[in-house]
């Protein structure tokens, strides 16, 4: 029997439309826990260490926006970090799904929540049997 882990993260905010943050996004990453990714994680940590980032937790938003500790890091160095993360993600046996709402077409938080809820519930209904089959 498999165990499916679902990691959920959001990006953006429910606030008014802003060209710097035009979307509200909810992402789900699906990982079958019977597939061990420890070696992949160790490899990523080693690669980050080799470019000067030992024990480094990657948060893409601050890297892209040059925030916090990434403020003084030049474009090429930030790109190297992101490329390591992209390569790591591509090789993993995971799947993901993104749900988003373009905020310029939204009246209020209730509409944002409603549109996202509809997308997520439709996805779950469509994939429900797949989720059950994985658990058998």
Segments the model singles out, each with a brief description of its role:
Residues 1-136:
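Phosphate-ester processing/binding pockets and catalytic centers
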């Amino acid at each position: 029997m498999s165990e499916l882990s679902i990691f959920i993260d959001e990006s953006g905010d429910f606030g008014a439309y802003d060209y710097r943050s035009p979307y509200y996004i909810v992402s789900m990453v699906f990982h079958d826990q019977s597939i061990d990714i420890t070696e992949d994680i160790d490899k990523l940590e080693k690669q980050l260490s080799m470019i000067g980032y030992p024990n480094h937790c990657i948060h893409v938003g601050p890297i892209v926006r040059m925030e916090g500790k990434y403020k003084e890091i030049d474009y090429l160095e930030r790109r190297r970090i992101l490329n390591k993360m992209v390569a790591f993600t591509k090789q993993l046996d995971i799947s993901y799904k993104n749900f988003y709402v373009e905020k310029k077409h939204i009246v209020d938080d209730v509409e944002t929540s409603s549109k996202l809820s509809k997308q997520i519930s439709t996805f779950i209904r469509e994939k429900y049997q797949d989720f059950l089959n994985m658990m058998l």
